[in-house]
């Protein structure tokens, strides 16, 4: 749906995002299934544009992934050597986008399935509620690849599971399945395979979240 949308929302749909309104819920779909919805620079920019320019009628948002995975993290085909200034700029672009998700004016629910890995876990951790179906698995492979967790996840993820568990994930490549992810705090809900999006879209949940979200949005940024 592009009619009557902000121009930046329309542009986002050319960069790997599909956007639509379902009642008062903004549904944001990561649409790079061939890449397992890996986060390219264009997709990160599109997430920023979407969450900075949601329609006024949006009272909640849901993020989900097209295909077999939520998000497999950084698009490694774009990985390249950067000098210090370029590295800071790239990291800040992720911070701005994920801050727009976490600190925007509506509560955001992530509907998780398949890979929630690296930058995908950073994105999920910026959401307020995470619903994971039974196919979900979590990992932080950055440490084994010599990549820094640079989008604010180094603060957000330890707040969910503790610094020791995050360190273990990064240093050993440990992978958590859906059940263990819920147990340690990576998700609040664990549902049968294929049902995460329906669970996330429940109107009662969106309404209940919205009533307290403005208090959450005034909290200091965790990024």
Please state what every model-predicted region is.
Residues 1-66, 85, 99, 203:
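Conserved CoA-thioester-binding segment of acyl-CoA-metabolizing enzymes
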Residues 8-11, 100-208:
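Crotonase-fold acyl-CoA enzyme core
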Residues 28, 63, 75, 123-125, ...:
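Hydrophobic/aromatic residues within transmembrane alpha-helices
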Residues 43-46, 90-93, 123, 196:
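Hydrophobic alpha-helical membrane-association signature
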Residues 57, 65-100, 116, 146:
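Glycine- (often His-adjacent) and acidic-residue-rich active-site loop
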Residues 207-213, 223:
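Conserved small/polar residues in nucleotide/adenosyl-binding loops
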């Amino acid at each position: 749906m592009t009619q009557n949308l902000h121009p930046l929302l329309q542009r986002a749909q050319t960069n790997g995002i599909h956007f639509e309104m379902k009642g008062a819920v903004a549904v944001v779909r990561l649409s790079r299934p061939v890449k397992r919805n890996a986060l390219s620079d264009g997709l990160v920019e599109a997430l920023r544009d979407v969450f900075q320019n949601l329609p006024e009628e949006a009272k909640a948002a849901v993020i989900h992934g097209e295909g077999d995975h939520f998000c497999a993290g950084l698009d490694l085909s774009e990985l390249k050597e950067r000098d210090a200034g370029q590295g800071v700029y790239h990291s800040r672009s992720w911070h701005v986008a994920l801050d727009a998700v976490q600190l925007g004016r509506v509560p955001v629910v992530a509907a998780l399935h398949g890979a929630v890995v690296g930058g995908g876990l950073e994105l999920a951790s910026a959401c307020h509620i995470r619903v994971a179906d039974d196919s979900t698995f979590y990992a932080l492979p950055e440490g084994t690849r010599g990549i820094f967790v640079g989008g604010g996840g180094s603060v957000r993820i330890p707040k969910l599971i503790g610094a020791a568990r995050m360190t273990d994930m990064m240093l050993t490549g440990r992978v958590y399945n859906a059940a263990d992810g819920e147990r340690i705090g990576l998700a609040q809900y664990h549902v049968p395979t294929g049902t995460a999006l329906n669970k996330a879209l429940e109107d009662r949940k969106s309404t209940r979240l919205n009533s307290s979200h403005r208090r959450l949005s005034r909290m200091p940024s965790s990024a």
